[in-house]
């Protein structure tokens, strides 16, 4: 429904209105909306109805009921008059809630409850993030106190276990040569180029019976040719 700004209905939005229905009931509430069929929406609405007595000697009595938000059908509406100006506390409902009591606190938006003169709390230097802009704090400032020594010791232990190269002091020579199957011991000449070194018994097994034939131990004569099969 297109309604002009000069409409009388729009001028009474948020007013306290008295609406009388065909059956005699009276609804008093804050006028919030309407449509082309004159269907009304009232909030904080109260209903007043007159109850007829059973005997003619008794007077009529009026009964009040608190309803809250009400949608009135336009086909039942008889009259509509202004009851009062808009309430000042439009953001607070007039309908009392059961067991609800107002507290001493004040509702405020986030970030507006701190006075202007109070400085904002800041994080410690070791826990603060980098500064926005060109640069930030140094590495010493960013490292938490009491953790640098432990981290350095853990890194050194990890490097030694992983087999990192050991630094030898100057003047004492380099590391000893690796011992392998093809490398001769210190002080002995290796085999000439093109020849494989002789195969000896496996390490950890002493020469004796059941071992493969190889070079005899030093100081012992080799057996005769016919006696080699008996050993």
From Swiss-Prot:
Tissue expression remark: Heart, and less in brain, pituitary and liver.
One matching Pfam family: LSM
First-listed, main subcellular location of the protein, grouped into a coarse class: cytoplasm
GO CC annotation: catalytic step 2 spliceosome; cytoplasm; cytosol; histone pre-mRNA 3'end processing complex; methylosome; nucleoplasm; nucleus; SMN-Sm protein complex
Post-translational modification Omega-N-methylarginine, affected residues: 108, 112, 147, 172
GO molecular function, one term: U1 snRNP binding
Post-translational modification: Methylated by PRMT5. Arg-108 and Arg-112 are dimethylated, probably to asymmetric dimethylarginine.
Modification Asymmetric dimethylarginine, positions: 108, 112
Assigned keywords, A-Z: Cytoplasm, Methylation, mRNA processing, mRNA splicing, Nucleus, Repeat, Ribonucleoprotein, RNA-binding, Spliceosome
Family: Belongs to the snRNP SmB/SmN family.
Protein name: Small nuclear ribonucleoprotein-associated protein B
The species this protein was found in: Rattus norvegicus (Rat)
